[in-house]
């Protein structure tokens, strides 16, 4: 099997290079009373950032990209709407499966990242016949947390830098895998959601499979509840899952009546528009698009991949 290595040099730097580029002149002015040292440091970081991005781009020239329409029978703009009764039935079945197979095992983040990256690489290789090796490095903080306060994790698709901003409990393997799909070069959110889910489900690892199913359940609940926070919490309570699982699901949505910060609301709207301008459906691709993708995949008669991958 062909092997390709994306260097991802920027991910091994002790600090996010984009953070250094943005803040070095300001920090230099505040600490030293002069901006020149900061500008020199910023320029050096920019050079490293550009060099890393160029090396990654050159490595990707030989990549075999997954054709989603061919492999799964659908793509961002060709999704079938999943019927509401089918959604509700799926919610009940996933909740039951999660309850029966629950594991409270927690894997240290650096080990989890390596495991997730391995299974993602192998899953994609089974489709393309090519292993694309990438970094497993993850940061705990970047300035993106201030810009996107609603996000649990981010990936700079230019440098491949990934950061997770908080402990995400049972969902963490999926969040890591989602960002690692971006690191491999797939920048559309629907593609990241789908490949992450399918890779984790194929792993056979109870912790990773649980994360995939929990993400699928969470997204179905979001679709059914819409913008109604109380409806979401009522749906979770109605499933009568074990307390540990219910708490994880409740924690993803604010209590009814609580207001998001104005920064979060504004940035969500801007990010939604940015996604639409790049040929995506917007933030809805995280939940409506993702669940519709799995539904369309199972209903497609011309997908190269076996539809049982989307079953559970």
PLM feature segments, named:
Residues 223-251:
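Amphipathic alpha-helical blocks and their helix-capping loop/short-beta junctions
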Residues 102, 124, 128, 184, ...:
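Sec/Tat-exported extracytoplasmic proteins
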Residues 172-186, 190-193, 197:
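Active-site recognition of the HExxH zinc-binding catalytic motif
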Residues 1-86, 311-312:
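N-terminal low-structure segments adjacent to metalloprotease catalytic domains
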């Amino acid at each position: 099997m062909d092997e390709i290595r994306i260097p991802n040099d920027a991910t091994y730097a002790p600090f996010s290079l984009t953070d250094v580029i943005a803040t070095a002149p300001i920090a230099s002015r505040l600490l030293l009373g002069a901006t020149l040292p900061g500008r020199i440091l910023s320029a050096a970081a920019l050079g490293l950032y550009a060099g890393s991005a160029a090396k990654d781009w050159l490595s990707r020239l030989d990549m075999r990209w997954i054709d989603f329409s061919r492999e799964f029978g659908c793509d961002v703009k060709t999704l079938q709407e999943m019927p509401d009764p089918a959604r509700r039935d799926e919610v009940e079945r996933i909740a039951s499966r999660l309850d029966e197979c629950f594991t409270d095992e927690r894997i240290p983040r650096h080990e989890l990242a390596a495991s997730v990256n391995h299974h993602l690489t192998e899953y994609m290789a089974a489709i393309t016949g090519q292993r694309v090796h990438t970094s497993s490095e993850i940061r705990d903080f970047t300035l993106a947390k201030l810009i996107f306060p609603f996000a649990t994790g981010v990936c700079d698709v230019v440098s491949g830098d990934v950061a997770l901003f908080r402990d995400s409990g049972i969902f963490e393997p999926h969040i890591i895998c989602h960002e690692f799909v971006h690191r491999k070069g797939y920048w559309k959110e629907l593609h990241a959601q789908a490949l992450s889910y399918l890779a984790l489900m194929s792993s056979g690892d109870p912790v990773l499979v649980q994360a995939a199913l929990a993400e699928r359940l969470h997204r179905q609940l979001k679709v059914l509840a819409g913008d109604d926070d109380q409806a979401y919490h009522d749906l979770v309570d109605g499933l009568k899952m074990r307390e540990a699982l219910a708490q994880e699901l409740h924690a993803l949505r604010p209590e009814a009546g609580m207001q998001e910060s104005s920064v979060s609301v504004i940035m969500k709207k801007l990010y939604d528009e940015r996604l639409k301008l790049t040929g995506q459906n917007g933030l809805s691709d995280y939940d409506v698009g993702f669940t519709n993708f799995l539904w369309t995949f199972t209903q497609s008669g011309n997908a190269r991949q076996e539809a049982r991958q989307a079953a559970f």
